[in-house]
Amino acid sequence: MTKMVFQKQILKDINWQIASEDCWLLTGPSGSGKTMLLRLILGLEKPDSGSVNLLGDYKYASVNAGVVFQEDRLCEQFSALENVAMVNERLSEMVAGEELSKFLPQERLTVPVCELDPVERRLVVMIRACIIPSDILLLDEPFRGMDSDLRDKVIAYIRDKAGHKGIVFVQQDDSGLEFCRKFVL
């Protein structure tokens, strides 16, 4: 697969297989195309040549993924509880609250996310991605702003919630992710 942006080749001859239950670290220097590759996997961009097939012969028009983008994509006026519960209609607010309480104090669950600090917002986004019914988790810089203790706790949570799903972490370094297979751009 190849992708060009503004007449500059961002990705060239990419051939990467991600199977269910795989855990990958997509890494490389800033500007190497990591986020673009995620956008291609998600179907948000089209390759200039080649194709994207995920988890074998994928039969759907789009990827069924839990996603953490680089920027926190939240409904700003809704609470953390509402932001998490809204992505899974089978999930009660009580269960959403239990998941959030693993990382946030109870009193922070019901305030609008626009009032949360950047790390709290990142935790809401990460929890939401993990509870969406999906085949794979795609996590772009999911630990931004977190110290190593919190990062390690979040990694354990992600691995637990992923179950048999594939996971792709996107980061410039492998801190805490030494257990992942690496794909370097």
What do the PLM-derived regions correspond to, one by one?
Residues 71, 77-95:
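Q-loop/switch helix immediately C-terminal to the Walker
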Residues 50-63:
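Conserved ABC transporter NBD signature motif
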Residues 42:
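Helix-to-loop junction immediately C-terminal to a conserved catalytic motif
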Residues 126:
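Hydrophobic anchor residue at the start of the ABC signature
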Residues 112-120:
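Conserved ABC ATPase signature
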Residues 140, 147:
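ABC-family nucleotide-binding domains
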Residues 93-108:
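Conserved ABC ATPase "signature" region
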